[in-house]
A protein has these predicted regions:
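Short acidic/polar capping segments at secondary-structure boundaries
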Residues: 17-20, 35-37, 58-60
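Short glycine-/acidic-enriched loop or helix-start segments at secondary-structure transitions
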Residues: 1, 24, 40-42, 64, ...
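FAD-binding core/adjacent interface of flavoenzyme oxidoreductases
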Residues: 1-27, 106, 117, 137, ...
Length: 170
């Protein structure tokens, strides 16, 4: 979105590290994304932030685990904005505001915002592993229990939790 590159590290973050999260005391923060990483970040940030708004392009049910949706909806200080995307951010040296666009109506709204955490667009960079470990159709490495139904697993024992198709390689 417009303005994000200029404010990266100054209110716009691509992760919720402990050091940044500890600075969110009593802040109203925005988490962008609708998959598990965004939901887990929202839960984590809700411990200290005044409020957390999850901005979701579609709905949580489209890409988040059911258990996590239940946890989010049980937390009083987490709000959902489905069918919404970030149009732009603004600030002079630090994030000050966010402009959100509702995808179903095209309506735009501006909000004061000092911190925005982005968890979208996971894109694997695993081409170099072609022929070495099993990857799914999207390029993500298949590991642990997910290997059981894939011909790449050759041992009699089941794969360990994060083990790839190369036994012993996690």
């Amino acid at each position: 979105a417009e303005g994000c590159a200029d404010l990266t590290g100054a209110g716009v973050y691509y992760g919720a590290t402990t050091s940044v999260a500890s600075e969110c005391d009593d802040d109203e923060v925005y988490v962008i994304g609708g998959a598990n990483s965004a939901g887990q970040a929202a839960m984590y940030l809700s411990r200290t932030a005044k409020s957390v708004t999850l901005v979701i392009r579609r709905t949580l049910e489209d890409s988040m685990s059911h258990y996590l949706i239940q946890q989010i909806r049980a937390r009083d200080n987490i709000n959902e904005m489905p069918n919404t995307v970030v149009h732009a951010v603004k600030g002079d040296g630090h994030l000050e505001g966010i402009c959100l666009e509702h995808t179903d109506t095209g309506e735009r709204e501006e909000f004061s915002c000092g911190r925005m955490f982005i968890f979208i667009g996971a894109e694997p960079r695993t081409e170099w592993l072609d022929g070495v470990v099993v990857r799914d159709d999207h390029g993500f490495i298949v590991a642990g229990p997910d290997l059981r139904d894939i011909s790449g697993w050759t041992l009699e024992r089941p794969p360990h939790h994060l083990e790839t198709s190369v036994p012993g390689c996690s």
